[in-house]
Amino acid sequence: MSKENVVADSWDDADADPVKELMDKVEKVKLLQRKEEKKEAFFEKVKAEESSGVVSKLQTEEGLGPSAEEPKRVFLRRPKDGFAASENVIEASPPTSADTEEQPVTNVRSRSHHKLNQKEKQPAPTYEERQAAYQAARNRILGTEYKPDNQEIKEIKFIDRSKSPETLKMTQQNMVEHYGEELSRELMEQPAEIVPPERQYTPDFTQPPPSVSESGGVYNGPPGFQQKQPNFQPTLQQQSLHQQQYLDNQYMMQMNVQIPIQYHNQTQHQFVPHEASAISTTSQNSNGDGQNDQAIYYYQAPTQQPMNYIPYNLPNMAYPPPNFQPQGQLHHQMNAGQLHQIQQQQQQCQQIQHQPPQQHQQVINGQVMNQQNQRNQVNSYPQQNGAGRGQNRQPMMYQMPCNSGPTAKPPPLMNQMQNRCMTNNGQNYQNRNMQQQGQQRSYSSQPQNGQFYQNGNSNQNNPNNGRKQQHQPQQQQNKSGKFGQNRNDMQKNNYQPNLQQPPMSQNPIPFGCPPRNVNAIREQHANNGSPNTGAGILGPHPMMSASQWPALQQNRPQ
């Protein structure tokens, strides 16, 4: 056998001698054949011994002798013709001492065949016997006192089919008629697969939360709630209070209306200028001067698209709903006498405003501040006496007048929470007045940098609230002296404990106010002026990546 004709079995042993490997394989095959022959010879020998009944002598310790009785070894082998002859397999029965070989093969059958033969031999029980056996078993199980309810079983009628043999015509009445009430109720139920799965409200982490940019630290409630004064645009000249239209829904007011607010340069909202035709420029003020021709900017709330089924406009049910009345009812409760008294107080304020500076400084600590507060309380509603927009640029819920006298009572919907927030507003207006005190500008008809002068816009600091000043230089000196006096009043009144307030019976902030630490955090953000990237105090959401929140690369508030 030459090396060229032999093919190696594997790549590993290609270098080995192929002839030698082939010879090794031949040797292995011969060894296996020899083993098989020895095994067959052993089986033949055992069969011959069993047939002769000679017990082989085993070598014991004493030498060759008869050993103890060995158990008989039975080799169960598979029949050569497959399982066809398995019914006639002879079971090995324990050998008896007398006749081991004379056992008839016919008696040895499987147990199942034995039982079948026994059943065939017995006659079938009659109906009476079966009834008696049933009664005995029932008495044994249920007791002798058991009496069955002999109810008539309705025969189920055959259900008529429709033209298509696959669909059944089945109505509720048919079901009740055929199957009874309970079973038909179960049958008419929808299967569990058709039940729609519950919608999971997963928050949308792709957008940062809205930034808190107001310096007052006021809790702005859930996004669907009306937070600031709505913009009431009168279409006709309204002669009486009853012709005005109010929003009476105190729980949810839509944020689609445009809202006039004051704003700073740090806010990131959209401000839409409106032409003068949308606003009644000849609205009658209570003082008779219709100077309302400044261009007014309106805050348009950014429209929020509902993503992932987030209900933006639902009220927050973790807090009780507010129990205050809508604004329309508050105004309708005012009678004519109160309105007349309010107009008289406003005329008195106008007379005191034109006094020389010495008298003005003497009077302003007493009765004038109280009248100013009452005027502020009335004018905080933008609907009063026509749309007096020049006077009321502050939203009502966010402004707290200084309570300096014993007769000053807070306006409705105000409580201690507003007084605490007012300390920030007072400081901001003081700083603004200190910056612009030496400049002494007259108001121009156009806003500068898209922003109003904040100099006279607060009701606390100047009774000339938002109107143009076209008086003599003496009036401007009066204004500068009065600013210093008012600043001292602000410091005294804001840091005094306010003891004249009645116990709080109404909830001015719609869904409760935040705890003190949240207020402090928001005030700290507003005072630092750091850009609120939405990451919050604890950093971004742990499951967020920086690519989903690109604003996080800026300096984060500490």
Swiss-Prot record:
One of its GO terms (cellular component) is centriole. Disruption phenotype: Temperature-sensitive with embryonic lethality at 25 degrees Celsius. RNAi-mediated knockdown results in 10% embryonic lethality at 20 degrees Celsius and 90% embryonic lethality at 25 degrees Celsius due to cell division and cytokinesis defects including centrosome duplication and attachment defects, and failed bipolar spindle formation in embryos. RNAi-mediated knockdown in a zyg-20 (it25) mutant background results in suppression of the embryonic lethality phenotype in the zyg-1 single mutant at 24 degrees Celsius. Phosphorylated. May be dephosphorylated by let-92. GO terms for biological process: cell division; embryo development ending in birth or egg hatching; meiotic chromosome segregation; negative regulation of protein localization to centrosome; positive regulation of fertilization; positive regulation of mitotic cell cycle, embryonic; positive regulation of mitotic cytokinetic process; regulation of centrosome duplication. Its main location: cytoplasm. Residues 69-81, 117-131 have a biased composition (Basic and acidic residues). The C-terminal part is necessary for interaction with atx-2. The SUZ domain is necessary for RNA binding. This is Suppressor of zyg-1 protein 20.
